């Protein structure tokens, strides 16, 4: 108390206190996750890399799909994830029934994207169409039904602007490698499960959105679409 050393010390601390008050205030934000805002494919690739490393350490003779490698096989031969195309496995939007407007919008969307017009029909492709409508658009898969053959198959869902048209393959197309083995052009599958020996192709027809005859047997007014039009 009152010693000579106390005054210099007091001045020292007061200068330090003033210097601190003159320092500019720095604002700090929240630390961001490096994966936030990036595409989901980045996270999926990280997850695949992690699972791949775990599988290799635990059991080098098993693949990611739990297939046991045979003698002479390598793990890389089964790792073909780069060639796979991503597809949602569950609906990403609320489920809903097909309506007239939704059927027309969905048809024109498929036409603009070029994903259906002129494509050979097959049961597998028809199931993929159902899955796409369910998972991406939330459309319950009770809309994709067709009139009976032979001849042109019309959609039973009013507003869907695609029909199945029989086509004849010329000789060059029949011998082309693209149409061999299990290609839909050679399988001749039919939506009603009865083989009529026809090769069907999806064909866009905008008139299906305005032409509706309730007396024609191939139309079924699903969910009262005409009333809700």
Curated annotation (Swiss-Prot):
Alphabetized InterPro entries for the sequence: HIV-1_Nef_core_sf, HIV_Nef
One Pfam entry name: F-protein
Keyword ATP-binding applies: no
A GO cellular-component term linked to this record: host cell plasma membrane
Example GO molecular function: GTP binding
Annotated segments matching region Mediates dimerization: 127-143
Keywords linked to the UniProt accession: Host cell membrane, Host membrane, Host-virus interaction, Lipoprotein, Membrane, Myristate, Viral immunoevasion, Virulence
Protein's membrane topology: Lipid-anchor
Chain's role: Seems to play a role in optimizing the host cell environment for viral replication without causing cell death by apoptosis. Enhances virus infectivity and pathogenicity. Probably involved in viral immune evasion mechanisms. In infected CD4(+) T-lymphocytes, down-regulates cell surface expression of CD4, CD28, CD3, and MHC-I or MHC-II molecules.
Extra facts: This is an African green monkey isolate.
Quaternary data: Homodimer. Interacts with host CD247/TCRZ; this interaction induces down-regulation of cell surface TCR/CD3 complexes.
Name of the protein: Protein Nef
Organism: Simian immunodeficiency virus agm.vervet (isolate AGM TYO-1)
Gene: nef
């Amino acid at each position: 108390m009152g010693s000579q050393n106390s005054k210099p010390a007091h001045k020292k601390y007061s200068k330090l206190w003033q210097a601190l008050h003159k320092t500019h205030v720095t604002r700090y934000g929240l630390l961001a996750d490096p994966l936030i805002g990036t595409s989901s494919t980045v996270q999926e690739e990280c997850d695949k890399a992690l699972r791949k490393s775990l599988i290799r350490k635990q059991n080098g003779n098993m693949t990611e799909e739990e297939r046991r490698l045979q003698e002479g096989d390598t793990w890389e031969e089964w790792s073909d994830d780069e060639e796979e195309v991503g597809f949602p496995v569950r609906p990403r939007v609320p489920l809903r029934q097909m309506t007239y407007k939704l059927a027309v919008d969905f048809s024109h969307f498929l036409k603009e994207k070029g994903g259906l017009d002129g494509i050979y029909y097959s049961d597998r492709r028809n199931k993929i169409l159902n899955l796409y409508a369910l998972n991406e658009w939330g459309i319950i898969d009770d809309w994709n039904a067709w009139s009976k053959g032979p001849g042109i198959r019309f959609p039973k869902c009013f507003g869907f602007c695609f029909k199945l048209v029989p086509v004849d393959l010329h000789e060059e197309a029949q011998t082309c490698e693209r149409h061999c083995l299990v290609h839909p052009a050679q399988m001749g599958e039919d939506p009603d499960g009865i083989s009529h020996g026809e090769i069907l192709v999806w064909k866009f027809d905008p008139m299906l959105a305005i032409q509706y005859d309730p007396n024609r047997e191939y139309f079924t007014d699903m969910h009262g679409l005409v009333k809700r039009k």
